[in-house]
């Protein structure tokens, strides 16, 4: 049950500029005061109701750019919420195996997705960056080292702020909460190359192949890359997604190699296009020459036809027989016609 504490929500226009419809905030009348589940948002026009935490931690959802510093009402526009609900229909929860799991592990290569309540049950770790207004969740398998910035998913007193421009929507600025997971990833990339080289030596990969793991590994990598690519296209990629792509592209030289090959492909296609254009030009010239020859042939044919019509159409032998016939026979044959 929700208390009616806000005016009806809907698209309002000021002149010719329509205002984006936002979700309305309500407080459940049956929940204890200050309880994390008491804050809900709904859209009368879209018939949508959602918990504040479910909105804040959904991987593909951010608040509107317009920030209200006078209160704690979040700025979720209805269109973005509908889009996130649609995206969640394809995602199954790693805990309950049901659809609608929009809260994903923030590591770019992890495929786990949750409902917010299922993430709590699975002992997931939440991280809040007060300065940037970001909300991140890590599955138990990829839980970062806990500092004072890391809070458990079971902590109901945690204040949550999220903004598209990475700004606070209300309250004084909080101290930045360090992402230990990102630090750990950087630490991995900064380790001596000997360790990395030892992990990818031929005998190790051969053992993976013998165990049937190599194909599974590469399929998993491709699936993760496809997932990250989808989030980049949808503009829902997280900070970890960008960091993972940056590491993949630049640290191993993949971007440089891909750029070089792409340039070679473009140059090759340009050469093929120029050759094709040259061939088409030759074909046009040949067709023009053929057209000229055809016109010349038709002119010569007309002259032959006119000259032949001035003489007899009968063969020479028939003409001789015809000339030897008597006038009466010729006249009779003419009458019979």
UniProtKB/Swiss-Prot annotation:
Zinc fingers (C2HC pre-PHD-type), renumbered ranges: 25-61
Iron-sulfur keyword on record: no
Keyword Nuclease attached: no
Residue spans of biased composition, Polar residues class: 301-312, 323-337
InterPro entries recorded: EPHD, PHD-type_Zinc_Finger, Znf_FYVE_PHD, Znf_PHD, Znf_RING/FYVE/PHD
Compartment list: Nucleus
Superkingdom to which the source organism belongs: Eukaryota
A Pfam family annotated for this UniProt entry: zf-HC5HC2H
Function in brief: Positive regulator of Th1-type cytokine gene expression.
Subunit note: Interacts with BRCA1 and RELA.
PANTHER family, per the entry: PHD FINGER PROTEIN, PHD FINGER PROTEIN 11
Name assigned to this protein: PHD finger protein 11
Record organism: Mus musculus
Higher taxonomy: Eukaryota, Metazoa, Chordata, Craniata, Vertebrata
Gene, per the UniProt record: Phf11
